[in-house]
Amino acid sequence: MFRQSLRSIARTRTGTIGVRTYAEAVNPDVLKVSLVAPHQAIFTNKEVSQVNLPASSGEMGVLANHVPTVEELAPGVVEVIESSGTASKYFVSGGFASILPGSKLSISTVEAHPLDAFSSENIKSLLAEAQKNASSADETVAAEAAIEIEVLEALQAAVH
């Protein structure tokens, strides 16, 4: 009986599941992006032409009318390309990117800062300190150091 109910629901709803929706925007080539961290909104509904993301599954480019999806972000650089061609880069420590119908992209991250705000000397010293802490007998200190190392190595690669 339960299987029959599921089959009837599946048959009646199949027509609407999996339908791709497109934006009904004034400019179909514009992607509206929001980049937010818990302590600040870096920008909200900024109109751009493309955003490149450091997804956990690999680098990902997002344009207007992209298929809706949710992606986990790895530590890396979010590149925002405006319609004029100018690009701004932000380092994110991780988070999620939600690509929504209507050519909208919402990026939620724990930390996000302009890439040019970092100096390679500071990164090297922080990385050396984290590597020392990684061999700590205290499991909490070692686990935190492992996370720091992952983020700092990604930051170091992005700055160079």
Curated annotation (Swiss-Prot):
One of its GO terms (molecular function) is proton-transporting ATP synthase activity, rotational mechanism. Its main location: mitochondrion. Signal peptide: none annotated. The keyword Ribosomal protein does not apply. Transmembrane segments: none annotated. Keywords: ATP synthesis, CF(1), Hydrogen ion transport, Ion transport, Membrane, Mitochondrion, Mitochondrion inner membrane, Transit peptide, Transport. InterPro entries: ATP_synth_F1_dsu/esu, ATP_synth_F1_dsu/esu_N, ATPD_C_fung, ATPsynth_dsu/esu_N. It is a peripheral membrane protein. It is found in: Mitochondrion inner membrane. Gene3D superfamilies: 6.10.140.880, F0F1 ATP synthase delta/epsilon subunit, N-terminal (2.60.15.10). GO terms for cellular component: mitochondrial inner membrane; proton-transporting ATP synthase complex. Belongs to the ATPase epsilon chain family. Mitochondrial membrane ATP synthase (F(1)F(0) ATP synthase or Complex V) produces ATP from ADP in the presence of a proton gradient across the membrane which is generated by electron transport complexes of the respiratory chain. F-type ATP synthases consist of two structural domains, F(1) - containing the extramembraneous catalytic core, and F(0) - containing the membrane proton channel, linked together by a central stalk and a peripheral stalk. This is ATP synthase subunit delta, mitochondrial. The lineage of its organism: Eukaryota, Fungi, Dikarya, Ascomycota, Saccharomycotina. The gene is ATP16.
